[in-house]
Amino acid sequence: MIRPTESVVPIDAQTAIFGFIAAWFAAQVLSVVLLGVFGQTGGADTPIEVLAVVLCAAWFAYVSGMWIVSTHHGTGSPVDDFGIRVLPIDLLGLGIGVLAQLVVIRIVYLPLGALWPRTFTDEELQRNAEELVDRASGGTTVVLFVLVVFGAPIVEELFYRGLLQRSLLARFNDVVVIIGVAALFAVIHLRPIEYPGLFVFGLIVGMAAMLTGRLGMSIMTHIGFNLTGLLLVL
């Protein structure tokens, strides 16, 4: 595929994979410990404020892992190593994200809903988002909005497309990498009913990051996608 020439030598794929796994594992340990401290299990009844603390801790682990990789195995500049740049044209990604949520994802689930009507219902597909919204009120609604619309898109694009995909593209076939990272992105969310939609969305943001050579477009697309999904259940 045609994509921009890298001005910085990408981080070695093996290093990126190890850094990804180590940071992800650290995030899980932190999450479990914090949930235990708050006396929570991480289920649907977990308060938004607790969820916010746990998520921020996990994201801290992700970003710390990326910083360590960049410092010891890259240029020392995360901006250059992970393509953390946003240009005005990247704002088009907001529209792409909205279309992905309203059109593309619906198309993905049409045949699935026809084949398994009791499984792939609108109620089931929106359950996770609705449970989050139902738990929020007042100030925690603002917290939820910030986490879903800004926190998750920025950190996830940094971690999946910046750290992992960017390094793998320098060594392996573009198509294989885009598909593989999108599949990993979907599976790690641990919500099987959402796997098809998350996988297709992963392909969209993966292509955006690869074709532009930076994370701005994929981050904006992710923001537009999450914002639309949240507004649909408010």
Q: What is the meaning of each model-derived region?
A:
Residues 39-42, 52-55, 120-125, 156-157, ...:
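N-terminal start-of-chain detector that recognizes signal peptides
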Residues 39-50, 76-152, 170:
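Juxtamembrane helix-loop-helix connectors linking adjacent transmembrane helices
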Residues 34, 38-42, 72-77, 112-120, ...:
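Membrane-interfacial segments
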Residues 100-107, 129-234:
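Transmembrane helix-loop-helix hairpins at the membrane interface
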Residues 12-20, 46-55, 89-94, 140-145, ...:
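Residue-level signature of transmembrane alpha-helical entry/exit and packing/kink sites
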Residues 1-88, 110-111, 227-234:
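N-terminal, membrane-interfacial amphipathic/helix-forming hydrophobic leader that caps
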